[in-house]
């Protein structure tokens, strides 16, 4: 889960409002239309402030938006189970120590639901001072409690570097392949729980 791949659309299924993609594993993945970021859709030059006639109307029919052979960057949302392939998304999320970067989801962002009360307000104030590029958003994790804007910005800069490396790697070759593998449980535990003062 959370691994990032370059994927190739192999079949568009209008009745499912989804497509199947080859992402370099034995089974093809399932990519619902609602999980495809605007950057991959035709006519994506539309300004965000233009009026929508409902989500479906702004995007048109799925078979008009996507084509077989089209390449996308996808992230595993749910692992393969039984005879079902993995559920995928193009809305990437990269977890750092204090933040989660969503590089192609400008409408996301905020503070983890687990943070409450005054700590939530303090964390919201700290992330409001971050230099988040347009078209991206961040979520402050519980580990961000008590951290200043400078520490959070350092984490954001690292995540931005990681995202640029993922984008660059996706351009190096065509076809389906693994771009980024989520760290092991041990590495994630160290990232999330180890503090210099321990």
What are these regions (language model features)?
Residues 1-198:
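Single-stranded RNA-binding surfaces
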């Amino acid at each position: 889960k959370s691994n990032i791949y370059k994927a190739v659309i192999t079949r568009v299924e209008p009745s499912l409002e989804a497509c199947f993609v080859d992402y370099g594993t034995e089974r093809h993945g399932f990519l619902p239309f609602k999980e495809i970021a605007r950057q991959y859709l035709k006519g994506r030059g539309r300004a965000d402030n233009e009026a929508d006639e409902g989500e479906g109307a702004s995007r048109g029919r799925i078979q008009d938006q996507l084509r077989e052979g089209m390449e996308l960057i996808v992230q595993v949302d749910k692992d393969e189970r039984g005879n079902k392939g993995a559920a995928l998304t193009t809305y990437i999320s990269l977890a750092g120590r204090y933040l989660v970067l969503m590089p192609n989801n400008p409408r996301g962002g905020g503070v983890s639901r687990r943070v409450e009360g005054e700590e939530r307000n303090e964390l919201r104030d700290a992330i409001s001072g971050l230099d988040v590029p347009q078209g991206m958003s961040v979520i402050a994790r519980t580990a961000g409690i008590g951290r200043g804007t400078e520490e959070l910005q350092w984490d954001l800069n690292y995540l931005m570097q990681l995202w640029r490396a993922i984008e660059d790697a996706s351009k190096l070759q065509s076809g389906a392949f693994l771009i980024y593998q989520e760290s092991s449980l041990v590495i994630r535990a160290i990232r999330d729980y180890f503090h210099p003062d321990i």
